[in-house]
From Swiss-Prot:
Role description: Together with its co-chaperonin GroES, plays an essential role in assisting protein folding. The GroEL-GroES system forms a nano-cage that allows encapsulation of the non-native substrate proteins and provides a physical environment optimized to promote and accelerate protein folding.
Gene3D superfamilies (UniProt xref): GroEL (3.50.7.10), GroEL-like equatorial domain (1.10.560.10), TCP-1-like chaperonin intermediate domain (3.30.260.10)
Family (UniProt): Belongs to the chaperonin (HSP60) family.
Cystine residue pairs: none
Record keywords: ATP-binding, Chaperone, Cytoplasm, Isomerase, Nucleotide-binding
The protein's name in its UniProt record: Chaperonin GroEL
Signal peptide, first to last residue: none
Coiled coil: none
Amino acid sequence: MAKDIKFAENARRSLLKGVDKLADTVKTTIGPKGRNVVLEQSYGNPDITNDGVTIAKSIELKDHYENMGAKLVAEAAQKTNDIAGDGTTTATVLTQAIAREGMKNVTAGANPVGIRRGIEKATKAAVDELHKISHKVESKEQIANVAAVSSASKEVGELIADAMEKVGHDGVITIEDSRGINTELSVVEGMQFDRGYLSQYMVTDNDKMEADLDNPYILITDKKISNIQDILPLLQEIVQQGKSLLIIADDVTGEALPTLVLNKIRGTFNVVAVKAPGFGDRRKAQLEDIAALTGGTVITDDLGFELKDTKIDQLGQARRVTVTKDSTTIVDGAGSKDAIKEREDSIRKQIEESTSDFDKKKLQERLAKLTGGVAVIHVGAATETELKERRYRIEDALNSTRAAVDEGYVAGGGTALVDVEKAIKDLKGETSDEQTGINIVLRALSAPVRQIAENAGKDGAVVLNKLESQENEIGYNAATDKWENMVEAGIIDPTKVTRTALQNAASIAALLLTTEAVVADIPEDKPEAPQAGAAGAPGMGM
């Protein structure tokens, strides 16, 4: 396909148009009084959401050059979401602010490479200052506040705090749809291990790139499956029952993997294959743990079992299994309480007898997985559209809370970024262009608070002017229209979310500024379809 190329000013201006179109859509959602965005779906009802990354991913612009600019901003949002789990709208607002100001200066003749150095220098100083003013999460109330701010719901904040209290900060918390209209919490027996699907074609939810299996059978083996004939009789029996299957094996290779994938794509049955967790003897022990939890049997040579002779009653079962690219979560296994308790007692005895700190640590990890359970948040709503929107909010809140536990929290509502701006305002660059880059970041740090104020119906410049004269952590609470200490009021953001949003925004914006050429496809003109009944047109029988 032929290509079209734009250079210098024309290239950057086209990219910036795309940046603005995406950012102007996303930034309307920031803050407690942010608006919703309605997304058209290829089928079914439209989605209503205020989730930044969901909106960013859904935007596809007609102009190729503008679309590239939009996709770069979407990447900043996506990377922030991947690392911190929230802060996507903040990342988008910061990217637009840095890119806009930078483009003005490059157009006026500044050197983009010097500006980039200044942006990087100011970003590093800002991140260092964020860590200095960060607070550690020490109470259930603080966890509830972080989650409440992210989800704009006090009830959700308390629900997530309860979940973390029950399964621990590192515990497994999953989110499921409820059959009723109430959102509730339950704790069930479950386990998570660090192994993801062997093929992305096994996913059942393309938006979240995860596979969800309801009431599946679970084949547990330490063998490598390369010949599909070894498990064919078992598969046929599972298909007849209309059940799904999770395969936990040493590996699935050869003809076996593509055959399973093909049957999944054709809709013959739902199957996901993952590698067994751990290595060597620890792998065997972990497989035995999974077998106890799910009521299955480990198919291994040690017990004289062959794959081709495996029967349905040797498979484990669970109410639900969720597999991502990195992890597998088994919820509510069908194992008997006696078998699980016996396994727990055995591990406790090994911990007492072990003389190795490393072995003790690994045994304690196994025990925690068996005893900790899985907290399940059942999300309820009156309609399907409301359910999706509520689920997005709860997922963001859960990710925010985990981020706060990791790196602490800072004053929310954009206040921390303005506090950082005040602390590093005297930062100096080695050249005038580098100083320009530093000044661009300093101005951009106030963009989130300006937008939050504007979404609340206030003049962003007036709010910012007053905020810059306040002491640290005193900010504008858009939810109550009051000026107060944001930390004491419970308006807090995870440091990790704020840090990641700034770093990704600076990185993408700097790339935009240093772009000198953009290459895009030239759309080909499609030939007009021949009119019906035209002379010489072949008939259907040919």
